[in-house]
Design a protein with these regions (language model features):
Chain D
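Glycine-rich phosphate-binding loops of nucleotide-dependent enzymes
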Residues: 2-288
Length: 290, 389, 349, 288
């Protein structure tokens, strides 16, 4: 392929990678800090998308407001869910966590189908982002995709700042590396967990809301994202935000160019990538040596 | 304690599924194996409604016998298909199978139907093999073969002077079969497919493929997607500005039941299908009226397929006065194959392999409707490759 | 792994004489009596059961083999795998592709299915055992997903529609057919034998030094290393054996369904088999079997309109809630319940 | 001073069985253990004492092979075992017990020991043989249980033992692997007086045939049985000598009590609650 095409493909890879990062970062935090494996995380992505769909008529063109409202709702939902459900999982072993969250997926999917049915729905792009610009001689690139990438980047940096600059972030990092130590520091661990979980849900939901206008909303949109996110977390290293970012981008590139060059085998690419990383660094790319 | 549990459980199984005795008199047992949960649930309901509508029009009787329904949710889950179909065949002892939407499931059903010598009418699943290599006298289809709409669109593209085309679809049978049909039709018109693009099902990350299309600059693109994929692909295609320079063609499923979600990005798209909602024939209008009254909802192509499934079955049963005994079997199946179905989509006959020989319509998206434009191919028959019938 | 605690087997009473020590391998009270009785009952069932009921029994029996193979991994070794369906599917594909258009002998198919499933298990094991806990779960899931895509996307296994098994395998000795799986009775008893053999094999395995080493690793791998066990080879061996047995179950499933489909490898299958063993009760072979029965019946119940009316079409909701309630209330599964009942009934010193 | 002079000990009792040179281990920025050299010889109990976080357990973990040292080397029975993984060292005769009791609670005492003994001759492929038929293993198990004074309880399920009993079983399991050297991490933690007595008696009998490293907080006990004492503070050795001279060593007293110290033994014992474990590198607690 010529250079221009190559560059555009890179752009696509980055854009996909960043979106993945938004979902995976929440997942990796929840893993890293609570040590809970949450299969239902994909459902939060779906929740976000459907929130965007449900809220768009209410807020109309107030896109920013819609996002904020969605994030707040999702965070609240996450906070409650942690209190009502996940807080009982910490003492359980991984096996039971897997089964309980697996059951949660079934429940969420059915609730979704009861609430909004099984049809596909589109979500409008805000007018001020609806245009697109010419990209070389090739094609037009919608402004909204640019926005999506930028938004993801902003969130990524914000997240990075929170984790590395604030007291909460300090506790999070400590929690990710050594849970006992945090307890030692006299931190209210339950509250920390609740906040982190709510944050994780909010992140996934935000990703869903940003993606909704691009992907539209449809049944089962969560679980396809989930497994790729697992791969991202494994590659990046549990609990590491930076790792999640790097891994997401890697996956983005492998997926994008896989589709172009080995159409038939493209589905396998990301998993091969994971295998390679496992051979090379079983703890993931960015796992701190503890 | 434990042994009693084990035996109790097995006993439970035993009693729960003891098969009822087969009956020649009494109602005809129709097994509806359709998706009632998950992504295809709405299709399943449409098909069931269509089927029942026709039976009601016949006074609730087929071949002079009452109809008794048995329902199983096939979950669109091929790996469970054999178990699910056996519930109908072996547990409920149905005389006729009606189903389903998902091709993989339908293939397993057809196999079971053949092995247990049960009649089967397929109201949607388009897998070519069902009326091809795996065809059998007792299995007929009221819908289409994946090949048909693709081929028709290929012909249309050829007429429009398309020389270099590309195809995009998911890595799954329905997609690849549809794409093959298109390529075949296009070559008739002197064009050819320069590249097939595909991605894992049910992935929806299309940007890479769109970029590839933009780079190759074909005269046209043919794509097969359904549900969420269809919506997203059409939107992304338009968002990438490709629809301005490179027309996007596809089978009707690309724009059926998805227009509300696709919105502006689908306007003016051309698709081929064996049905169009606004088909202005007395038969279609009557059907739509009756359906709307019966179910307070607008029918779609799936309701039509369900409706016609009942018609084909009725024709067969009529010929033998509802006598399903082995002796009358041949007469029954022959009648089903010979019947000319007066369908809302227009009259059609069945091929030897049991697939409709039907007109393929060219439709154009206007607003939220697929408007009938012209007949793309008249009385198109599936090649039924590999069928011995 | 945080597998400590869940998998505590019932404490054996100390009636044994010195030298005949309490044997954690034989974790089931009553030893072989109960399984043998169950097998006899199953062997007699065809006399009373309708053909459909027989099929259901066969189906459950095959799932039981599958569940037993996973129990060896999760219950006995403490390795929670969320990708076990891959081996089931690979075994099934191996069987179908091996028998081709004209069918093949079981003498050929069984080894093939076992070997290929084991081979993939070896590869996955080598990689995934470099990780532990949450990682291990995710990695096994991911590799199962990879196998899924290979069969679903590529021409390797007939794509998304899968492949049919045109001729069911037979077993011929000196020209005479001794076993023809196309015959319902033959197949029924073949499956029964496989189930019994698998159960016996795993029970034997757990009673052996190898099994005790696995138990030690499950309870406290650190201590085992300190004692001088190189634990990874043990875990790998368990992983491969479990994979091979799952492959055997896959072969039976392919024969039963007369074909294979990539959905067999989907992660929902992996989830369901995990459900089976925890429903029945982790850390007990019987639990795995009971779990297979219970799960199949539970799903039937959730889907039956007769029981739940309109809710039946939303059976996943019911199933999900039931699972949550169950895991929350009975972490040790039905076996645990049985034990509790027994202990209440006859408290032991 | 900071350099422990091994020659003193080697002179006393033949060549060292286990000798570490310049061991160091850093966690991130912090040096848990820094340039520690230590020797163990048969016939000698070498005690390591020190405040919490002095790096005692980290040291044991490096000697047993659970933790790879960032610097230094470990030699055991004439081999350089620095790169050997723990299981290999264990099979070579380097046994250890854990500060936090790590048994197989659901097994019988005998099975606990038999399993440990099995490591020597695993023969895992013979899956048709019941483990309970492992006569050799059982014999070893019963022998070591007797040595540890648990013979009567061979049938009992480990989980039901008293705390002291569990600590004894720990030692028994160590012995079952037929070790030449024993690394004991606070075997007395949380024991009653009379249990402690029994344990000390056991240790003194064992030392005739084993080289023993004893990490302990109970000063009275240490000074009762140790032939040599090494004192660690902040990951470094500040003194290593025979007990009498350690008692009176200024640096040690300052390290423990600040100035104006009476005699260390009583003071330190009072100051350091029994079973108070070092904060660093909890062995047995597996990272997640």
């Amino acid at each position: 392929m010529d250079l221009a095409t190559f560059l555009v493909q890179c752009l696509n890879a980055v854009q996909y990678g960043l979106l993945l990062f938004l979902v995976a970062s929440g997942l990796t935090l929840i893993f890293g800090i609570m040590g809970v494996i949450n299969l239902a995380h994909g459902s939060f992505y779906m929740l976000g998308a459907y929130l965007a769909f449900a809220l768009s008529p209410i807020f109309g063109d107030q896109f920013a407001l819609r996002l904020v409202a969605g994030v707040v709702l999702a965070a609240a939902f996450g906070y409650v869910l942690e209190w009502a459900f996940f807080s009982f999982l910490y003492q359980r072993d991984h096996l039971q966590q897997v089964l309980l969250t697996y059951a949660l997926i079934l429940v969420f999917e059915e609730l979704r189908s009861l609430a909004v049915g099984n049809d596909v729905h589109g979500v409008p792009v805000p007018p001020w982002l609806s245009g697109s610009f010419r990209l070389g001689g090739l094609m037009e690139y919608p402004w909204y995709r640019v926005f999506a990438s930028v938004a993801c980047l902003v969130v990524a940096f914000a997240l990075y700042a929170v984790v590395n600059r604030t007291r909460l972030g300090m506790m999070i990092r400590a929690g990710a590396s050594n849970r006992d130590m945090v307890r030692g520091l006299g931190v209210d661990i339950r509250r920390l967990y609740r906040i982190v979980f709510a944050g994780g849900v909010a992140l996934a939901a935000l990703a869903g809301m940003i993606a909704a206008p691009l992907s539209s909303v449809y049944p089962g949109m969560g679980s396809s994202v989930l497994i790729v996110c697992f791969v991202v977390v494994v590659i990046g290293g549990i609990g590491s935000i930076t790792g999640a970012l790097v891994a997401s981008l890697l996956v983005g590139f492998v997926d994008t160019f896989g589709k172009v060059f080995f159409a038939e085998w493209s589905g396998v690419g990301v998993y091969l990538l994971m295998a390679v990383v496992l051979v090379w660094r079983p703890e993931g790319l960015m796992k701190r040596a503890v | 304690m434990r042994p009693t549990f084990t035996t109790l459980a097995t006993a439970l199984v035993a009693t729960a599924f003891a098969a009822p005795a087969f009956a020649q008199s009494g109602p005809i047992k129709v097994g509806l194996m359709l998706p009632y949960s998950g992504t295809y649930a709405s299709l399943g309901n449409a098909i069931e409604n269509g089927f029942k509508l026709y039976v009601q029009e016949q006074g609730g009787k087929l071949g002079g016998r009452e109809v008794q329904y048995f329902k199983v949710d096939d979950e669109s889950e091929p790996s469970k298909a054999t178990d699910n179909v056996n519930k109908l065949i072996k547990r409920d002892g149905v005389d006729v199978l009606v189903g389903t939407v998902h091709s993989g499931v339908a293939l397993a059903m057809a196999k079971a139907a053949r092995e247990n010598n049960v009649l089967m009418v397929i109201p949607n699943a388009g897998a070519d093999a069902i009326t091809g290599a795996l065809c059998s006298a007792g299995v007929v289809r009221s819908s289409f073969s994946n090949w048909q709409p693709g081929y028709a669109m290929g012909i249309v593209a050829g007429q429009k002077g398309v020389k270099r085309a590309m195809t995009v679809t998911w890595n799954y049978a329905a997609g690849t079969e549809s794409v093959k049909g298109f390529a075949e039709g296009l070559e008739k018109g002197g064009g050819k497919v320069i590249k097939d693009l595909n991605l894992p099902f049910p992935g929806v990350e299309f940007q890479a493929l769109l970029t590839e299309i933009a780079a190759q600059k074909p005269d046209a693109v043919y794509s097969f997607f359904a549900g969420g994929g269809a919506v997203k692909f059409v939107k992304d295609y338009a968002a990438a500005g490709l629809n301005k320079t490179i027309p996007l063609y596809g089978p009707g499923f690309l724009t059926d039941g998805t227009l509300e979600a696709q919105g502006a990005s689908a306007q003016g798209m051309l698709t081929t299908l064996h049905y169009a909602d606004d088909l202005n024939t007395p038969r279609n209008n009557a059907f739509r009226k009756a359906y709307a009254i019966a179910y307070k909802a607008q029918p779609d192509v799936y309701s039509v397929q369900g409706y016609d499934a009942a018609q084909i079955l009725a024709a067969g049963l009529k010929a033998v006065d509802g006598d399903l005994s082995a002796g009358k079997r041949d007469a029954l199946t022959t009648a089903m194959h010979k019947t000319v179905v007066d369908s809302p989509r227009g009259k059609f006959a069945l091929s030897a392999a049991g697939n409709p020989i039907q007109d393929m319509y060219l439709r154009e998206v206007k607003g939220n409707n697929n408007e009938f434009r012209s007949i793309a191919v008249k009385a198109l028959a599936d090649p039924a490759r590999g069928c011995k019938l | 792994m945080r597998s400590d605690g869940i998998v505590t087997a019932p404490l054996n009473d100390t009636r044994a004489e010195v030298g005949e020590l309490p044997d954690i391998g034989r974790r089931e009270a009553g030893g072989w009596a109960v399984p043998t009785a169950a097998v006899l009952v199953l062997a007699l069932l065809p006399l009373v059961l309708s053909p459909y009921a027989q099929d259901v029994v066969v189906r459950i029996a095959i799932y039981a083999v599958f569940a037993l193979s996973l129990e060896l991994l999760v219950g006995a070794t403490g390795l929670v795998s969320l990708g076990h369906a891959a081996f089931l599917g690979i075994g099934a594909y191996a069987a179908v592709m091996g028998s081709g258009e004209s069918g093949a002998s079981l003498f050929f198919l069984v080894p093939i299915a076992l070997a290929i499933a084991a081979a993939y298990a070896l590869c996955v094991g080598l990689l995934s055992l470099r990780t532990r806990g949450v990682y291990f779960i995710m990695v096994t899931l991911a590799f199962a997903q990879m196998a899924y895509f290979v069969f679903h996307d590529t021409k390797v296994g007939g794509g998304s529609d899968g492949i049919f098994l045109y001729v069911k395998p037979v077993m011929q000795i000196a020209g005479t057919t001794v076993l023809d799986l196309a015959n319902r009775a033959h197949f029924y008893y073949a499956v029964l034998v496989v189930l019994a053999a698998t159960y016996a094999f795993i029970a034997l395995l757990l009673g052996s030094r190898f099994g005790h080493a696995l138990a030690g690793i499950r309870v406290n791998e650190q201590r085992m290393r300190a004692a001088g066990f190189s634990t990874t080879p043990y875990k790998l061996a368990a992983f491969v054996i479990a994979g091979a047995l799952a492959g055997l179950a896959g072969l039976l499933l392919a024969v039963k369904d007369g074909g294979v489909n990539p959905e067999l490898l989907s992660w929902h299958t992996s989830g369901e088999v995990l459900l089976m063993i925890i429903l029945g009760g982790i850390g007990s072979l019987r639990g795995a079997v009971i779990g297979a029965i219970a799960f199949t019946l539970l799903k039937e119940a959730c889907q039956s309109e007769a029981l739940l009316g309109p809710l039946a079409s939303h059976w996943q909701l019911t199933l999900g809630l039931v699972i949550i309630g169950f895991v929350a209330a009975l972490p040790r599964g039905l076996i645990g319940l049985v034990e509790r009942v027994r202990q209440v009934g006859a408290p032991r010193g | 001073m900071a350099d422990a002079s091994p020659t003193a000990s080697t002179a006393a009792t033949g060549t060292p069985l286990l000798s570490a040179r310049g061991l160091g281990r850093r966690f991130g920025g912090l040096a848990a253990v820094d340039d520690v050299s230590i020797d163990l010889a048969v016939g000698q109990i070498h005690a390591v004492i020190g405040t919490n976080g002095a790096g005692k357990s980290t040291l044991v973990n490096m000697l047993s092979g659970e933790l790879a040292p960032s610097a230094g080397s470990v030699h055991f029975a004439g081999h350089d075992v620095t790169r050997w993984p723990q299981p290999r060292r264990a099979r070579a005769g380097l046994g250890r017990s854990y500060q936090r009791t790590t048994l197989f609670p659901e097994f019988s005492l005998a099975e606990n020991c038999r399993l440990a003994a099995q490591a020597g001759a695993p023969r895992p492929w013979r899956f048709w043989e019941r483990a309970s038929a492992d006569r050799a293993g059982l014999a070893t198990a019963l022998r070591v249980l007797a040595e540890a004074g648990l013979a009567a309880d061979a049938e009992r399920v480990a989980g039901t033992l008293s705390h002291g009993g569990k600590r004894q079983l720990e030692i028994a399991m160590c012995l079952a692997t037929a070790p030449q050297a024993l690394l004991l991490d606070e075997p007395l933690a949380g024991m009653g007086a009379e249990e402690t007595g029994r344990m000390l008696a056991l240790l003194t009998t064992l030392k005739a045939t084993h080289a023993i490293l004893l990490v302990e907080h109970d000063m009275d006990a240490v000074f009762k049985v140790a032939d040599r004492v090494t004192v660690m503070v902040n990951g470094q050795v500040i003194a290593s000598d025979v007990p009498e001279r350690i008692r009176t060593d200024r640096a040690v007293q300052i390290a423990y009590l600040g100035d104006e110290a009476p005699t260390l033994a009583a003071g330190a014992a009072a100051l350091l609650p029994e079973g108070a474990g070092p904060a660093l590198g909890r062995p047995g607690g597996r990272p997640r």
